[in-house]
Amino acid sequence: MNRIKDYSKLEFDIDRWIKDYYYFHAIESLVVGVSGGIDSAVVSTLCAKTGLPTYVVCLPLDSKFENSKLSDIHTKNLESEYENVTRVEIELSSAYYHFIHSVNWWSDAQHFDKEEFTANDLANANTKSRLRMVTLYQIAGAKKGIVVGTGNKVEDYGIGFYTKYGDGGVDIA
């Protein structure tokens, strides 16, 4: 395993890579979902440090209070420290519950076993991830930007631990 020896060079290389992508594709902003975890904190900070227009997005959705609080603190700090950063917060719980209600209504009409159909925790978690992804892309579309992924190498490329068309749905990572 190769160990990183020069973190300043790594930061410079990431900064250059993001800027090269940004200018080559003539985009106008970076959009990063901030969960309150370390991965999104690092990625959002690296994006902020580029000096490019960056939208850091909090998407509370039945989140653990601690994660929402950390996300809130981190994004507010970035917005106050970097002039290029805009903080966005969109509460998604009501949209999620409306969707689940609609699916429940449909399952009743189709005579599905409602408990089996709606009680699948993995499916519900994946739906939350996909709702967040759709929201990030809505912001990116409105701001002529790209969605920057926050997954880490082991999760995304090693064991494939991400939601297809959810947190794995990004433009660059």
Predicted regions: what is each one?
Residues 160-173:
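A mobile, often basic/glycine-rich helix-loop segment
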Residues 1-163:
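ATP-dependent adenylation/nucleotidyltransferase module used to activate substrates
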